[in-house]
Amino acid sequence: MAELKKLGNRAPSRSSYFGIVDLCGFKKDRFYIYQAHWRPDVKMAHILPHWNWPERKGQVTPVHVYTSGDEAELFLNGKSQGVRKKGTGEKDRYRLVWEDVKYTPGTLKVVVKKDGKPWATDTVTTTGKPAALTLKPDRSEIKGDGYDLSYVTVAVRDAQGRMVPRSKNQLTFKVSGPADIAGICNGDPTDFTTMANPENKNIMKIKAFNGLAQVILRSRKGESGKVTLQVISNGLKPAQTTVTVK
């Protein structure tokens, strides 16, 4: 336990805190530092952290940017926070950092240049409270062989449709039609909710983590037709999506 605490991990945990994607395959912030370094040809910029910190109003909150460009200007609510350029040192070789940004709700925007020319932008905005759910399957058609899967991403969103990054609402999934819930996940290494569904229950529950969760649908062998997946959460507008089994 002591060693885990030294590494910054809470225990018990079902997985490591390291890596560039979580248990669901959702990209962590660190994903983008590797993308920027390994794919310098891809125009990209990524701001971190998110900008939902009501308890930090007026406090210094450093902002980092991962980018394949070589210099960037950061704006908070339209006001420039200065320009940063990549260097050769350990600190500024892979990221650009604004150490003295004071948290104010609103919008962070970074404008990146490469070789003096416009390259990429990124924006993060303070969101409202959770208001609705959305579902997005990675595949809308799967084979009826009893093995094919559709991974469905669940997002908690505010009234303007923006994903709420700190939300952890309890989610309930219900499926009907020629497919079963193969498993659920939220990417939280400290959440020990059962992910697998060996009994093929048509209802499962899990909390959102950082505004996201995932449900995996598996086709039934020899069956075809339309599968309906619903997700509900107390106080939020529910969501529904369909997947076709052929």
Model region roles, listed by residue range:
Residues 60-62, 68-70, 74-83, 121-123, ...:
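Short flexible loop/turn segments that cap and initiate beta-strands
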Residues 225-239:
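Ser/Thr/Pro-rich, low-complexity mucin-like regions
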Residues 1-147, 159-160:
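Substrate-binding clefts and catalytic carboxylate motifs of secreted carbohydrate-active enzymes
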Residues 120-129, 236-246:
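Short beta-strand elements
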